[in-house]
Amino acid sequence: MLAVSLKWRLGVVRRRPKDDGPYSKGGKDTAGTDGALVCRRQSIPEEFRGITMVELIKREGSTLGLTISGGTDKDGKPRVSNLRPGGLAARSDLLNVGDYIRSVNGIRLTRLRHDEIITLLKNVGERVVLEVEYELPPPAPENNPRIISKTVDVSLYKEGNSFGFVLRGGAHEDLHKSRPLVLTYVRPGGPADREGSLKVGDRLLSIDGIPLHGASHATAIATLQQCSHEALFQVEYDVATPDTVANASGPLVVEIAKTPGSALGISLTTGSHRNKPAITIDRIKPASVVDRSGALHAGDHILAIDGTSTEHCSLVEATKLLASVTEKVRLEILPAPQSRRPLKPPEAVRIQRSEQLHHWDPCVPSCHSPRPSHCRAPTWAPGGQDQSRSVSSTPFSSPTMNPAFPCANASTLPRGPMSPRTTAGRRRQRRKEHRSSLSLASSTVGPGGQIVHTETTEVVLCGDPLSGFGLQLQGGIFATETLSSPPLVRFIEPDSPAERCGLLQVGDRVLAINGIATEDGTMEEANQLLRDAALARKVVLEIEFDVAESVIPSSGTFHVKLPKRRGVELGITISSASRKRGEPLIISDIKKGSVAHRTGTLEPGDKLLAIDNIRLDHCPMEYAVQILRQCEDLVKLKIRKDEDNSDEQESSGAVSYTVELKRYGGPLGITISGTEEPFDPIIISGLTKRGLAERTGAIHVGDRILAINSVSLKGRPLSEAIHLLQVAGETVTLKIKKQLDRPLLPRQSGSLSEASDVDEDPPEALKGGLLTTHFSPAVPSVDSAVESWGSSATEGGFGGSGSYTPQVAVRSVTPQEWRSSRLKSSPPPLEPRRTSYTPGPTDESFPEEEEGDWEPPMSPAPGPAREEGFWRVLGEALEDLESCGQSELLRELEASIMTGTVQSVAVDGRPGSRPWRRSREVGTSPEDLQELLLPTPLEMHRVTLHKDPVRNDFGFSVSDGLLEKGVYVHTVRIDGPAQHGGLQPFDRLLQVNHVRTRDFDCCLAVPLLAEAGDILELVVSRNPLAQSRRTPGAPGPSSPQMI
């Protein structure tokens, strides 16, 4: 067994003899080690010499807290030999022991004796400006395959005017003196020391997202002093992996030394080795003692801790053993296989979003040290090779975040005592604002001239009271300052709920926390809201983010590169619905706020051709999902965007435009058709004659609806489009796409016209619409006018095999026909959804003609002419009620007609009467034309049933409608009361014992039916065409229970 001793000292504070005075140093100071230091320091070559100015402000009667040695009468130049802990000079974090003092307030010390220097410092006044000479830190290490540079984000809280470390180096006019900004001292007990991640020799890359590449020492110090109470530092450090560890093939003994009180920085978990339980390193905290040693890695098995075997130890016991070590720990480990360790840095991915360079990989050469060796990407990240993200914070002006890898022990909220004002509870709830992504008015110019648009989304995070949500915010200069703009996400902890959700990125604006707007409050209140939410383990954030739209492909094949982090989804959902062999997979959904969504180039409906150059033509969907999950760092997607899926289709002879309709309490007068397949188009299949939509002149049958009230229908089935229309409100905005290179419904020879009634066979559109009611069910469709009219005959019938064919919207002479022209398309409750579109007859199929072309309805016993005139006038009056929005009066009239004394009424008000158009004999019989041109009839029946005394039921079962509310007869028992009373399957229950059930579902209707007693009175609507081809059947095993 090999023994490797790796010791890492965090720093030793050397005790010195008591000072003779506040600034003087006795003769002992020049002896021993200090004398060697003086000799070495007095011979600093010019190329290693740095100069800085230090300004200290001391109170009257107090001292600077530093000890000066040297002078013309002493051994060497004046220098700082000691900094009193807690003194002004030590807390300034601008001086190091060994620095030379060249001047005090402009007075040169070269020719002064030691006592003169001390007197000068005592009497200098409150403001002291020291010119300090120091030795430059060593240059960046040369390229070494065993030295890996890593980066870490560290959040520190300012104490006084410093963060507890001394910074030296920086850019210089003389290139030979240019150095990275290096931490040369970490003050014991200071903020950096208490946090525990920063060590001497670490290189500072950025402060609060401001890159320090090319910054001088003075600029870096000024940036530090201008930071707010809390700042985020991006630091680079080196990890050297010993050859013994790198080439080990068996157990090793690793000895790690640490400062008492500091943590090792590893967390343990349970695993197995050779089918035996084992204690394994789960993860290593970045920049911790263990991480910097390079000897341990995630996945290593710990065999013993300080000689105590872990073979029979539980996870809790092993963790306690590690926590009990003081200065040195001796671990016996079995290194994980080399294949599980990332030995070379991941490929850098850079995205430029502003004038400053932002990057996905935190180690971009232009943002860090001028030396190439500083651009090694880290090889460790929790859960895999993590990639950080950076998003410009437009439109709010704030420093752009440039985060790196996991923050070591960075708290998710300020740790200082907080006393927020109580205004957060009284602040108004945020009013939600919706911006249309379909309008150019929402586009803005982001940093660097990139075109973006902002979107908002809600993110729900589940955390715990101890670790919170892994989210840090930034806003304002002071914590108690009222925010003029929403706070930004400044840091996301790795493997936290905020990172795992995949919807948050650094730079996002947090508009509201649990419904309370952040713009009206302070940072203290925002942090307090997060703390309170952590106690409840859940928070709802409303965030605003930028979506790039500089390049939005409308068609063709292109590639998209997305950064991928292990454990975080890209936000893409792929589908293989109705996919045939050789066809590509379809992106069915993109999660709002995800990495895929923010690119602005991917949309639902895009075809996914390849992932990382792996073609998916013949791959099953499960294989494609597995490929996506296994990708790391960078995912390359090959996408094809078809023109049918594009909103902009000028190249294919189509035009898109927006139409705004105002209901004024009335219906829209349109009928839409589609399927439940997500990417099948939603088509306008019917328009009501002289209805609101038709009167605009901009909407026609065959037009495709792209969006409803700025909500895109891309990837949405018909049922969702129906719901959007039902909740659209008084003003409905439709985005329409019209194909211009072909007629919408081409008229063939023989179509009806004003010159001739019927010359040849009916057009195919009519045949397809009506004949399919006999032979093939059509797709479900809905008239959006129905929901805005309480009684606009939603008892619509069904065509053929349970499908609905839109009614011919022509002017009738009876109120029932007037109502039937506005029937809502109602899909059958038990019919499967179809994937084909069969247009029904619409008003576009019938050119508007004079009323003289229409004959009065034919009846076996025609009534007097006075009755004909009455119905015509009543129909006109009802149309007037529709146009002026008198919906309540219309409902009362319709209800009175529906509840009349007629037991069985056809749609025209008299049994058997149907309007039909006169035709000439041109080879087609009038009977055929009558069958094609007649509107689908609708019958209403009043049925009285008596309960079967033997079975104690009425002999029928009910079921819900497919896409709308409504209760339908499901089955009728043979020789039961329902069959004897004339009830048939697919009858819709409108009333049960004089209670309206039109808007009921089975949950409400079944109790009503059960309480009916021995007599049940029903009012039902029926489509005779649907019933003529169906016979009642006995209930099967899966049928609903008989009522």
UniProtKB/Swiss-Prot annotation:
Keyword Repeat in annotation: yes
Keyword Cell inner membrane: no
PROSITE patterns for this protein: PDZ (PS50106)
UniProt superkingdom: Eukaryota
GO biological process terms held by the UniProt record: artery smooth muscle contraction; neurotransmitter receptor transport, endosome to postsynaptic membrane; Notch signaling pathway; positive regulation of AMPA glutamate receptor clustering; positive regulation of blood pressure; positive regulation of excitatory postsynaptic potential; positive regulation of neuron maturation; vesicle-mediated transport in synapse
An annotated GO cellular component: glutamatergic synapse
Matching InterPro entries: GRIP1/2, PDZ, PDZ_6, PDZ_sf
Biased composition (Low complexity): 388-400
Molecular functions per Gene Ontology: glutamate receptor binding
Post-translational modification: Palmitoylation of isoform 4 mediates membrane location.
Known partners and oligomeric status: Interacts with the C-terminal tail of PRLHR. Interacts with EFNB1, EFNB3, GRIA2, GRIA3, CSGP4 and GRIPAP1. Can form homomultimers and heteromultimers with GRIP1.
Its biological purpose: May play a role as a localized scaffold for the assembly of a multiprotein signaling complex and as mediator of the trafficking of its binding partners at specific subcellular location in neurons.
Family membership noted in the UniProt record: Belongs to the GRIP2 family.
Protein name: Glutamate receptor-interacting protein 2
